[in-house]
């Protein structure tokens, strides 16, 4: 059987329980979506073999995660509830897809994940496994046995497992598109996370301007430095913007299973990229390109959050989003300051805010006053007819 492995308490329990108590042959796989260093991945692999897995595989999914998911979140300027860049929910889908592919490759008879019965991840993993590897047995020991953290620790200690059992004051989930932060403050409806809870501490003061270069909606350069892949640009921008404490917030959302949840997150690079990209779009896209794209992108983000990445409608929306980016090319200038940033402006050969076509609020040479009088009369003609008939029948 294949186990999606993170090296944490839940998946460590799964390995030991399934190998020692059930006698199963467990093949662990970790999908790196930007949250682990090489040394951390090596330590996780060592830990997996110590626990008793038959094989352990590390999948580097950073680039495919961007290509298949993040790219479209940027195209759509997607923020769940106008706040959250879907940092963890998008990441889980990439992980589930790769775990399913690994299970198919090994012709596994079962697939295992360490989700509890309380959150969104159980639905995302179960649903994608059911779609991609139909008929395979899905085993979820933590959920099915309703295990507490204390019970898991006691079991692993009884088996002589050595690992860090200290529960951190804050749960951290780091990835390419942001980091979630959970603690006692997020378990209630009021309260801010303290400074020490944030994984990236503020080390920069003053201000700094960065130039982001987009080509057809994708971030290709930062301050004229080119990158082989946009995921590398995201990681580089994170090192710059993260030190200003940018992209910190608390998201209140509706879970797939019907309860509301509150989670902190820091997403310096994602938030700067999304706002910069949106600013560029507002200059180069027409009114209704923006209007329809906003509607489709909102649905796309909501459906992605629900785990429905395999729905064919998502490919249809992605095709539209891709098409909309044909002219989203140019430079965006962003000023970074501690805890905030602002878009200074853009430069693009596709900028529709060209002075030769008129200046907002000023005189222009593109039309005459008589042209506007005629246009205004025709533009409101049907509404005028409606109100005329309405009044005559009262």
What are these model-predicted stretches?
Residues 1-4, 9-394:
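Nucleotide-activated chemistry modules centered on ATP-dependent adenylation/adenylyltransferase
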